[in-house]
Amino acid sequence: MDSLPKIWLQAWETLSTRAIEGLFNYVEPYKTYRPYLRVWRVAAVSNERGASTKTGGTTTPCTSLVDTKFGTMYDNVSNSAWCGLYDKGYPGQPGKTLNDLWTFVSEALPENATETANNGGCAVVCIMNVPVYKGLVNYYTGTKRTIGFVCASTGTTGSMTGYENVFVHEIGGHAIGHLADCYISS
């Protein structure tokens, strides 16, 4: 979880547990296949709580910078679900990258898990400690990496905007299930 000062470790414990339970206790096929999937939780302590904000565009500077472990950002435009990191740093942004996150997680995993992670056998999820309804998953075919970001939405548990549902949608649907969104407008 990014943007987690040390005093918030209990919040990370609660949010990560809610995410795992939301995926494996209520949603098929994950409920049935739970014994075949391994989950490791890795806490990362940040200097500040929150995430940097920006308005559209990969190279757009942030409108506010927050000093977090992974430098996560989110687009504060209401119709954008973008949140996370880029593959390289840009001026006016926190300067941290997807590779920084991947390296931190890889180094924290048990030895036997690192090979699986580096061969496309896992998805890394970064829970962003900001109360907004946003989530995103990126696939990187060249490196066989799948990295997802889920913000700690304050929507009602069990509702479409509830944190657990956003986690299930992004991680169960996109990161693990490799399903695409299908939106229809009238």
Which residues does each predicted region cover?
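N-terminal module-boundary/linker segments of secreted carbohydrate-active enzymes
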Residues: M1-L4, Q10-R18
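Active-site-proximal segment of zinc-dependent metalloprotease catalytic domains
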Residues: M1-P5, L23-S185
